[in-house]
Regions:
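Non-catalytic terminal/accessory segments
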Residues: 1-595
Length: 595
């Protein structure tokens, strides 16, 4: 497909027939995609203003949606506004769209991604396929060596203050189809409902909308291009000038070697190895690097504070004039990286205080770097905060809310926590030290939780559930609390997290969520297209999707009652799926409890 913008939009939207064919195919795929998301995110089963969810959605409703789009009569409903707590105790507004609007937005997102992903900046990492917080952090670590000053960017209420007309103007540069642009305008202007009162959307991307992240990236792509221009403009000098002190020592060492005084020559060499060969304060050498993740960005500068201040003012001016956004004067800081750490995406960024460091260049040659190797570290307050639920008076403590869970679920929950923490901070220089500290308290909190559940002691839990596993260094075994259980594939073992905590040098190649969603979506689409009710076997009938939040909760409910599971529960449990494709009669009877 040609990604020049005009060609893409014309191919998709020039004729009603091709438009509808593409939309129908995309909607069926997107229905599966949204089903897969709702299996992972409980909030996706929350009804919007029309009370609908994926449960009960059918191909007939998709056809009705397509007709509305075909004749330009589709109108998104206002989102239902709710509030969720933030870490600082305040509440953050969240919008919940109607399910039909989610479906249309998913199709729009796919089209926008096909047009814009090939042209997005390499400095942008948020909400993009194969990019993440890790790729943003790795870019800083690998390209910002020698940084003196860092601008920590903070855009005041970025997503809430995106100007609709500017956004549509930006979109029109790449998309020449008025119908598609009008569809996006409708989403932008849909408004929201709060306490049964409708409010208009005057600015910002659709709250809770699937298209919001990519629309924000398209908007801020203008800023990305501006910063690429700034970087090129402020780049000065091919390399730093030689460091005077280093040259003097090099001259003295050469003279000592000529005189045959090897001991003195070695001493000069040791002194040379402790200072840079090139002048880190060379005023004729300047670099500006920029990295953005969503609305968070940093600008790393090799240069003077005056240069940093000048760039900050130019950023503020561009934001205000071109994007109608405000750079927070209070929160946007200029930090001297030699004196203070910078917080970005949950990590702390610091600069090595060693004068020199041996590094390997792009073709594998060893060489000394100028001082200032960038290091990523785990903030100490993150570990303290994460430990709060698991300690009391400085000692490991049980989690009361987990006492009534089966032992295997207790272990599974603890494993998910430490694995998630390590996976996020695996790029940090001190990840092993920091996570090991967390691991000690976390592990014994798990043991104490199991002990309280079984009215036992730590010692007895270790005796009962201890499993010998190989040590990480390969020398012998060690005992870790875990559990053995049976599956259809045979016996299996789950122990507390025992993976290596070593630092990861660079992010692994990440597969985007869309990859998994397409696979899962295709399965659901095939089931819908089969024209067979999965419960009664009726053929060639209108089919609907039944969806549950948590399959295990449904199964557990019948087991607690001691009553046989209905056929539909047994079938979902057997297929290990949270969805069933049913005829209308079966779906109604299921909800009425008569199946």
């Amino acid at each position: 497909m040609n990604h020049t913008g005009m060609t893409v939009s014309t191919e998709i939207f020039s004729m009603r027939t091709s438009f509808c064919g593409h939309i129908k195919k995309s909607m069926l795929s997107s229905l599966g995609s949204l089903s897969f998301r709702s299996q992972r995110v409980q909030g996706n089963m929350t009804p919007g203003t029309d009370g609908t969810t994926i449960d009960g959605f059918s191909r007939k409703q998709i056809s009705q949606l397509i007709e509305l789009l075909k004749w330009e009569r589709y109108q998104p409903k206002p989102v239902r506004r709710t509030y969720i707590p933030k870490k600082n105790g305040k509440m953050r507004p969240l919008g919940i769209p109607a399910f039909a609007d989610k479906l249309v937005q998913e199709v729009v997102r796919q089209i926008l991604e096909a047009i814009y992903e090939p042209i997005f900046s390499d400095n942008s990492h948020g909400f993009r396929p194969n990019r993440s917080c890790h790729t943003a952090l790795y870019q800083i670590k690998s390209t910002c060596r020698g940084t003196n000053w860092v601008i920590e960017g903070d855009i005041t209420g970025c997503f809430d203050h995106i100007d609709h007309e500017i956004l549509l103007k930006i979109l029109s540069k790449k998309i020449d189809d008025g119908r598609f642009l009008e569809l996006i305008r409708k989403f932008l202007k849909a408004g929201y409902l709060e306490f049964n009162q409708k409010y208009n959307s005057l600015s910002g991307t659709p709250q809770g909308g699937i298209i919001s992240p990519i629309l924000a990236n398209i908007y801020l792509h203008e800023f990305d291009k501006f910063m690429e221009g700034i970087s090129a403009e402020y780049t000065k000098g091919k390399q730093r000038r030689p460091y005077r002190e280093y040259q003097i020592l090099q001259y003295k060492r050469n003279r000592a070697k000529k005189k045959g005084n090897q001991e003195q020559a070695d001493e000069y060499l040791r002194q040379m190895q402790n200072i840079p060969a090139l002048d880190p304060m060379d005023k004729n050498y300047q670099r500006v690097k920029y990295v953005r993740y969503a609305d968070d960005f940093v600008v790393c500068i090799i240069g003077s504070k005056a240069t940093a201040n000048e760039i900050k003012e130019r950023i503020a001016g561009f934001m205000q004039k071109e994007l109608h956004l405000e750079l927070s004067r209070e929160k946007t800081k200029i930090t001297n990286l030699s004196d203070k750490r910078v917080r970005f995406l949950g990590y702390e960024i610091t600069k090595s205080q060693e004068n020199t460091k041996q590094v390997v260049d792009s073709i594998g040659r060893k060489k000394r770097s100028v001082n200032g190797t960038i290091q990523l570290v785990v903030p100490g307050d993150v570990i303290r905060e994460k430990l709060k639920p698991f300690i009391k008076k400085g000692k490991p403590y049980q989690v009361g809310a987990r006492v009534n869970l089966p032992v295997i679920e207790i272990i599974s929950q603890y494993n998910a926590e430490i694995r998630g923490l390590y996976n996020y901070y695996c790029l940090a220089t001190d990840v092993s030290t920091k996570i090991s500290t967390f691991q000690y308290y976390h592990y014994f909190s798990m043991i104490k939780t199991i002990a309280r559940k079984e009215k036992s002691s730590v010692k007895k839990v270790i005796q009962k559930y201890g499993i010998d596993v190989p040590r990480k260094n390969g020398t012998g075994t060690m005992r870790i609390v875990g559990i053995r259980y049976n599956t259809k594939e045979g016996p299996k073992t789950m122990t507390y997290f025992n993976d290596s905590l070593k630092k990861v040098s660079r992010p692994a190649g990440e597969i985007s969520d869309q990859f998994g969603q397409v696979l899962k979506g295709g399965q659901l689409m095939k089931r819908l297209n089969s024209d067979v009710c999965e419960l009664c076997g009726a053929e060639h009938c209108a089919l609907e999707i039944h969806h549950v939040r948590k399959l295990k909760d449904i199964v557990k409910k019948y087991r607690k009652r001691g009553t046989p599971m209905p056929n539909w529960v047994w079938l979902m449990s057997y297929m290990k799926r949270k969805t069933l494709v049913l005829c209308h009669d079966c779906h109604v009877n299921l909800h009425n409890g008569t199946l």
